[in-house]
């Protein structure tokens, strides 16, 4: 079974995308995220603790207000090299039309060099549900109740 496909408007801001480097693309048929590349002019070394804002060379417009996009880290970069997103997750609203920028942070112990065109993050498009707040005095009791962090244990 294949996933639903919808068009996504994209502006190419760096002419190397689609010529020297691939446009944002799904790595496999079942990938959830489009790989985003570092639109750098030269290699950039992140020493431990450094964070930089990198261009992906594209802008998107989701158009449909029932959609949003999230910029997520690439698992291998975080696990192997300590390179994660500086803001955890980037949320792209449907009405945003500016350049996609990625905050990369080296939380590792060694310097890491990002080369021009390297895949640095992934973009996942998600449906959203907008809510209307309903103020109440009490909640109908649930099985969990107000049990918070760690209340279910690890086993």
UniProtKB/Swiss-Prot annotation:
One of the Pfam families matching this protein, by short name: dUTPase
Keywords on record: Hydrolase, Magnesium, Metal-binding, Nucleotide metabolism
Cofactor(s) the record lists: Mg(2+)
Residue positions binding substrate: 74-76, 87, 91-93
Catalytic activity as recorded in UniProt: dUTP + H2O = dUMP + diphosphate + H(+)
Enzyme kind, highest EC tier: hydrolase
Gene Ontology biological process terms, A to Z: dUMP biosynthetic process; dUTP catabolic process
Gene3D superfamilies reported for this sequence: 2.70.40.10
GO molecular function, one term: dUTP diphosphatase activity
Pathway noted in the entry: Pyrimidine metabolism; dUMP biosynthesis; dUMP from dCTP (dUTP route): step 2/2
EC code: 3.6.1.23
InterPro entries membership: dUTPase, dUTPase-like, dUTPase-like_sf, dUTPase_trimeric
Domain of life, source organism: Bacteria
Family the UniProt entry places it in: Belongs to the dUTPase family.
Classification via HAMAP family: dUTPase_bact
Chain's role: This enzyme is involved in nucleotide metabolism: it produces dUMP, the immediate precursor of thymidine nucleotides and it decreases the intracellular concentration of dUTP so that uracil cannot be incorporated into DNA.
Name the UniProt record assigns to this protein: Deoxyuridine 5'-triphosphate nucleotidohydrolase
Species: Xylella fastidiosa (strain 9a5c)
Gene behind the chain: dut
């Amino acid at each position: 079974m294949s996933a639903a496909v919808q068009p996504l408007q994209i502006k190419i801001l760096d002419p190397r995308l689609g010529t020297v480097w691939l446009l944002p693309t799904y790595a496999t048929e079942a990938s959830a995220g489009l790989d985003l590349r570092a639109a750098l002019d030269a290699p950039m070394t992140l020493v431990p603790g450094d964070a930089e804002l990198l261009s992906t060379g594209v802008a998107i417009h989701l158009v449909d207000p029932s959609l949003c996009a999230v910029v997520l880290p690439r698992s291998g970069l975080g696990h192997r090299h300590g390179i994660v997103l500086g803001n955890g997750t980037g949320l792209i609203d449907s009405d945003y039309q500016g350049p996609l920028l990625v905050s990369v942070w080296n939380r590792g112990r060694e310097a890491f060099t990002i080369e021009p065109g390297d895949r640095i993050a992934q973009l996942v498009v998600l449906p959203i549900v907008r809510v209307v707040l309903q103020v109440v005095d009490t909640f109908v009791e649930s099985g969990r109740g107000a049990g918070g962090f760690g209340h279910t244990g690890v086993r």
